[in-house]
Amino acid sequence: MLKIRSLGHSTFFLDDGTHRLLIEPFLEGNPRCPVTLGEVQSWQPSAVLISHAHGDHWGNALDFGRAGVPIIATAEIAGYAGAHGANNAVGMNIGGTYRAEWGSVSLTPAWHSSSFPDGTYGGMPTGLVIEFGGQRLYFAGDTALFSDMRLIGDRELDLAFLPIGDHYTMGPEEAGRTLDLLRPRVAIPMHYATFPALTGDPAVFRTEGERRGVEVRVLDPGETTEL
């Protein structure tokens, strides 16, 4: 059984009963995060996964990395983390797969941008295909719709995390079109309602999923679902 807990915005905590993953550690400064940094640290994640370097995704990465938790991301993000005291960072690139005791993560393309809050270049933005808890998950990161999502869908996805906020990423209608390409069993919307510009409505995305026979689960911050 895989438990997935929303921590607001695009931040999720995954627990398969043995190992735990933190995706996009945007905790402090996240107006939708229902827990403290200290609480999440006490959950002892096995790894931190980051799709790109923008502050609302990079977040508190160094608080975990400096404590020895591996940060898994692009080579540029891992290099930045290592230069700032996160000595176990794992640098990858698009097309590569990192394997660990808990499972694996592969980097895919994403159509967006990537730089750290201080302006340092963060490499290419990515999506993540995660094998964890007996499930295959696609975390799209921040992205627009792109046709090669069909190739990601060929991996037979159990779950897709998709941004729907619009303005900086695709909105709910475009995210609905990705379901035709990705063909996941379940989809979870993310990256909406955190800031005024992110106006995408999860109810619209749910309707898009219903039209395509995809189960959409809308998680409030702090809410948990299971696969």
Swiss-Prot record:
Keyword tags: Hydrolase
InterPro entries in the cross-refs: Metallo-B-lactamas, RibonucZ/Hydroxyglut_hydro, UPF0173, UPF0173_UPF0282_UlaG_hydrolase
A molecular function GO annotation: hydrolase activity
Name of one Pfam family that matches: Lactamase_B_2
Keyword Electron transport in annotation: no
UniProt family annotation: Belongs to the UPF0173 family.
Record's protein name: UPF0173 metal-dependent hydrolase DR_0006
Organism encoding this protein: Deinococcus radiodurans (strain ATCC 13939 / DSM 20539 / JCM 16871 / CCUG 27074 / LMG 4051 / NBRC 15346 / NCIMB 9279 / VKM B-1422 / R1)
